Curated annotation (Swiss-Prot):
Catalytic activity: Eliminative cleavage of (1->4)-alpha-D-galacturonan to give oligosaccharides with 4-deoxy-alpha-D-galact-4-enuronosyl groups at their non-reducing ends
Source species: Ambrosia artemisiifolia
Protein name (Swiss-Prot/TrEMBL): Pectate lyase 5
PTM note: The N-terminus is blocked.
Source organism superkingdom: Eukaryota
Amino acid sequence: MGIKHCCYILYFTLALVTLLQPVRSAEDLQEILPVNETRRLTTSGAYNIIDGCWRGKADWAENRKALADCAQGFGKGTVGGKDGDIYTVTSELDDDVANPKEGTLRFGAAQNRPLWIIFERDMVIRLDKEMVVNSDKTIDGRGAKVEIINAGFTLNGVKNVIIHNINMHDVKVNPGGLIKSNDGPAAPRAGSDGDAISISGSSQIWIDHCSLSKSVDGLVDAKLGTTRLTVSNSLFTQHQFVLLFGAGDENIEDRGMLATVAFNTFTDNVDQRMPRCRHGFFQVVNNNYDKWGSYAIGGSASPTILSQGNRFCAPDERSKKNVLGRHGEAAAESMKWNWRTNKDVLENGAIFVASGVDPVLTPEQSAGMIPAEPGESALSLTSSAGVLSCQPGAPC
């Protein structure tokens, strides 16, 4: 009787330990999921948690909107134009920014209603001036080679936007003028400063599988109250100021910013700001940094930066080995900022001088965290960064 009683205690103890065991990564999932679920994770043809949601499916072209369920990080829940119609871009022209014709990208992006925007064929779209993207939009370049040049996208006071599989490069400073930004008449706008994607006062934004390079100012600038942003699976090359999160040290509205930088590759003559953060809370997870010019990750105004599972391969110059760039404060003060490293891999002499303490996360912060894989996995997790070549009837 006593032996039977002890067996019951042991059984329930083991069951309780199993239930309480945290699930942190794909490896953990493989240990506890049934065999068929484990097989689905490892044979989908994907390399990370976002791509695993959709890339292994040959019917993606018939089910494009399934992508809307795949965002992770602080942009999780961004569904773009899922609840709207499919809008097909049939013309690469942008010759009337005040009254764009139906069939152009600018016409679709400005509409007040939700739209899932796709492209009829390969296109090089030379935007004459900045293109304003309204709320509840998906710009989905899968199935075509879509290049945006000369001017970039502006997201101002909007929510729920997905930008996916778009190549943006050679964005220049452009003058203002009357520009269509919604269903109403065109309104005057100031000139744009050469950002590929400029985001202000917006939320629920997801940029995924884009290739961005060679613009005058930033490739992605997010500021002035923007939050719930994920930049993932993208390729950043040939640029000085890559990602800016936060307008200025004096802009305290950015204290509430939550942003995720995940599964991206930074390479081929990128200099700095990958990202540069002010105020706010940032997870930088499982990215591949293949050399830099000035620094990789930087900031000022006491942001919290959690660097997890990244690969940092430093440049060859001995003076450029530091991963981090601290700005705006004396060294003693900046070493109080919570800039933490976990599971990162440092190569070619890279140096990461952590500071502060591991912060206690709020429920909102915890909910947006992506489980970090070891930095040794960063190369495989980012091997498909940038635009994908997707053909209907086959997995991307």
